[in-house]
Regions:
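Charged, low-complexity intrinsically disordered terminal segments
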Residues: 1-133, 143-154, 160, 164-467
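Extended, Lys/Arg-enriched charged tracts that mediate electrostatic binding to polyanionic substrates
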Residues: 136
């Protein structure tokens, strides 16, 4: 009984700390409103940055390895989750190879996910103990400070030599990278290249953002101990990384060694980085507001892709305003049965009619694997791609990054990529009926999933702002 009492007290302390700290959702400040009104995405000048969207998981892995292999001075990698599965080991091997060449590596990982995937892991110790590598964790998991627990870093990007980068929604493991057996998530990234960056270019915006979050007090070092390299398990892990990476490199050598991106990228007029605050508390919804204003000013079309929809009244109101101004306003998300997130699935099932009432057209993806893409298509010249989900967690709790790209070529590429998924979706109508122009076979909603949804809705629905 004593142990049970202690457990209940600790659980109550954790729950109370989390709920009190994150219950209040800040409003948009006048400063943000003013900055958004004068948004730099409206400024067009001669831009030297070129870009291309990365749609497929195997290509996403190869392009990351390519950036790392050809880096000469510095590599920056920031990711929400990093696992030591097949694709994760290939990235670790590529980073270790770069460090051996004298390239300075800085790796930043979310402190909750790293506690699960990296602690006690010799593959990560093999990298952290290298003299040319620094690894930091954002907001390390600390049960004694539950009021900081939900502030997570959701960013995903890789920068090479301050000239080229990949940014998007993919984490660093098999679900998102490569083509390995097992579960998959579909997502997208943007590759941006600029051989001679100007001060206002997005690569410099991203580098400055990284320096700010890297140097803030909530980012602390991960096992910065060079003696770890002497452990037998670490030595064996490093050898395995080197062998697996070398095999992958030899199989893809021609493409990895190609350093001219001109023929595979498109010109852009402007690329702008949009970001949330980086502290660990409840955040001002900067990204939500700025994206909302962008969409309100569309001339005739807004198309959103998101894995989850968990909104409050402020967010619903934003969509109502967009629907009043834009004739073609739609969103595609996972169906209840196809959603890999039980919280997102349960909330969508409960609030689907409320979403429809805003005036937005909803398409439900039925592709079998959970769709994880986070993108917005605006008219025929604006594309928005990054890590931001259409939910309260992305709006108020997590660090998030989205790229606003002004380019008709990128817009066309994004439209084609979106359409590939929409052809495996159905439009939900009021009353629960469907418009099914593509004759899609829906995923079965199993009894087991129905029970999960019921439990989440009735036991955890009050905490929907945390999921």
């Amino acid at each position: 009984l004593v142990i049970l009492a202690i457990f209940l007290c600790v659980a109550f302390y954790e729950l109370l700390g989390i709920c009190v700290a994150y219950k209040k959702q800040p409003e948009v400040s006048n400063t943000t409103k003013k900055e958004t009104k004068n948004g730099s995405w409206n400024e067009c000048s001669e831009n030297t940055e070129r870009a291309v969207i990365i749609e497929k998981n195997p290509e996403a892995l190869l392009q990351r390895v390519r950036l790392i292999k050809n880096a000469k001075k510095e590599i920056i990698l920031s990711t929400f989750a990093f696992q030591s599965d097949e694709s994760g080991k290939l990235i670790l091997g590529a980073l270790h190879d770069a460090a051996d060449r004298g390239v300075h590596i800085r790796l930043l990982v979310d402190g909750m996910e790293s506690w699960i995937d990296m602690e006690g892991n010799p593959y990560f110790y093999g990298l952290s103990s290298h003299e040319n590598v620094e690894i930091k964790l954002y907001n390390k998991a600390n049960p004694l400070k539950p009021w900081k627990m939900m502030g997570r870093m959701h960013d995903k990007y890789l920068i090479a030599d301050g000239k080229r980068y990949i940014l998007g929604g993919r984490n660093t493991y098999n679900y998102f990278l490569g083509d390995f057996p097992g579960h998959k998530n579909y997502d997208r990234d943007v590759l941006v290249v600029c051989d001679e960056p100007e001060k206002e270019n997005s690569v410099n915006q991203l580098s400055e953002y990284f320096e700010t979050i890297w140097n803030q007090e909530d980012s602390g070092y991960f096992h910065n101990n060079k003696k770890l390299a002497n452990r037998k398990s670490v030595k064996n892990a490093v050898l395995e990384l080197q062998n697996s990476y070398q095999k992958y490199f030899e199989e893809n050598k021609e493409r990895i060694c190609e350093t001219d991106y001109t023929d595979e990228t498109f010109e852009t007029e402007k690329i702008t980085l949009v970001s949330n605050p980086i502290h660990t508390g409840s955040k001002e919804p900067v990204v939500w507001y700025q994206l909302g204003e962008l969409m309100k000013n569309a001339k005739n079309r807004v198309k959103i892709h998101t894995p989850y929809i968990i909104c409050n009244d402020m967010m619903y109101n934003t969509w109502e305003e967009i629907a009043e101004n834009v004739s073609d306003f739609s969103i595609m998300t996972n169906s209840v049965a196809n959603n890999g997130n039980p919280f997102g699935s349960a909330d969508y099932a409960k609030n689907r009619n409320r979403i429809l009432s805003t005036g937005i057209n909803i398409w439900e993806y039925e592709g079998g694997y959970s769709y994880h893409g986070k993108s917005i298509l605006i008219d025929d010249d604006l594309s928005v791609i990054g890590s931001f989900n259409m939910d309260m967690r992305s709006a108020y709790l997590d660090t998030e990054l989205m790229l606003v790209i002004r380019s008709k070529d990128i817009n066309k590429q994004l439209e084609e990529g979106m359409m590939e998924y929409e052809k495996v979706s159905r439009q939900i109508l009021e009353g629960g009926t469907y418009n099914d122009p593509y004759h899609v076979e829906p995923i079965e909603l199993t009894k087991k999933r129905q029970r999960k949804i019921f439990l989440v809705q009735h036991l955890l629905g009050w905490a929907r702002y945390l999921f």
